[in-house]
């Protein structure tokens, strides 16, 4: 075999090995998605698919934390520096600190291996960094239409955590 043919054969073999490696990875990712029920929700960035009932949740919004607390949904991480008094149980060591509302600690978030990250307007320009770590939902509340935005957030979280009936039954108490 001449030198040119050997180089072409070597490149082809490397390409085939890479293709096989990538095809195996895609199949395992597809299997994981197929085994998980997914819900489609509307956030500030549009329509997003989220695994239903994620277990490892990080939030960067205390309003969302309050909703999750009322829905009896556990979180694993939050910014702990300025947690409101009525949510002070989340200052416990049981919950990981993931930076501040304005300056997330992306390393700390990544180490938690979350299934879902919920962020708000203060982290609006950081969406891509969060999305590299886990599925990220962007929920916010506009002061000019607070009640409608809050109700929408309740609906989104109710759908994600399979608590839609609870939200409907308790909407007056939650708003």
Task: Name each model feature, range by range.
Residues 113-119, 135:
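Proline-aspartate-enriched helix->loop->beta-strand connector
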Residues 56, 61-108:
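A short, structured surface patch at a secondary-structure boundary
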Residues 35-37, 53-54, 93-98, 114-116:
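Short, flexible loop segments at the rims of nucleotide/cofactor-binding pockets, characterized by
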Residues 3-63, 165-175:
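Bacterial Sec-exported substrate-binding components of ABC uptake systems
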Residues 40-45, 49, 98-110, 124:
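Early extracytoplasmic/lumenal segment of secretory-pathway proteins
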Residues 126, 134-175:
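Extracytoplasmic substrate-binding proteins
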């Amino acid at each position: 075999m001449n030198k040119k043919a050997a180089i072409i054969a070597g490149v082809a073999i490397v390409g085939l090995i890479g293709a096989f490696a990538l095809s195996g990875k895609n199949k395992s990712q597809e299997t994981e998605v197929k085994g998980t029920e997914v819900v489609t929700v509307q956030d500030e960035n549009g329509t997003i698919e989220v695994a239903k009932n994620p277990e490892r949740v990080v939030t960067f919004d205390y309003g969302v934390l309050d909703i999750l607390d009322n829905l009896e949904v556990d979180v694993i991480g939050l910014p702990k520096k300025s947690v409101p008094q009525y949510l002070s149980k989340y200052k416990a060591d049981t919950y990981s600190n993931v930076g501040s509302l304005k300056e997330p600690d992306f390393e700390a978030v990544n180490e938690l291996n979350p299934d879902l990250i919920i962020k708000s307007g203060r982290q609006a320009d950081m969406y891509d960094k969060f999305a590299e770590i886990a599925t990220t939902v962007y929920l916010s509340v506009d002061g000019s239409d607070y009640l409608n935005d809050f109700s929408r957030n309740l609906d989104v979280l109710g759908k994600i955590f399979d608590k839609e009936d609870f939200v409907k039954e308790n909407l007056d108490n939650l708003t």
